[in-house]
Amino acid sequence: FKQSFLHRVELLKKIPVSQVQEIVANIKLNEQLVEFIKTYKNRSYIVTGNLDVWIDGLIEKLGMGKNVFCSKALVEDGYVQDVFNIVEKDAVIRQMVLPFVAVGDGNNDAEMIEAAEVGIGYGGVRPVAPSVLECATHVVYQEDKLVYFLNKLV
């Protein structure tokens, strides 16, 4: 993950942070998931490798406050200059109060999903990575089914 992430950042360094923020702001969100997160924001966390400067608007929109673990970047003159912290999901896991539920779709989510009491592979946007399929206790492909299941767990 680290190498591919740094390569992606290197490509996006040429684009102003404000433009990336605008793209992120226009991503269609799963409304039922947004409502779930807002309802349970004190019990929900976002753990992502994405850069803080790219997702700050999204985090604010969700009202997540400090319940976010993400990578951090140095910005100068409106452009990413350097990444000074890449989130390590396994380190985040060790900070979680047990038991916890984890939802993810990518290879970099597998350790977190495996460590969770309930690990959910969610294929709502793209196929669930094989590494997640191997360790998930559940796999869901529809937003309404995911939200229904999460509501049963809280």
What are these regions (language model features)?
Residues F1-T39:
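A metal-dependent, Asp-based hydrolase signature
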Residues A25-V154:
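C-terminal cap/substrate-recognition subdomain and adjoining C-terminal extension
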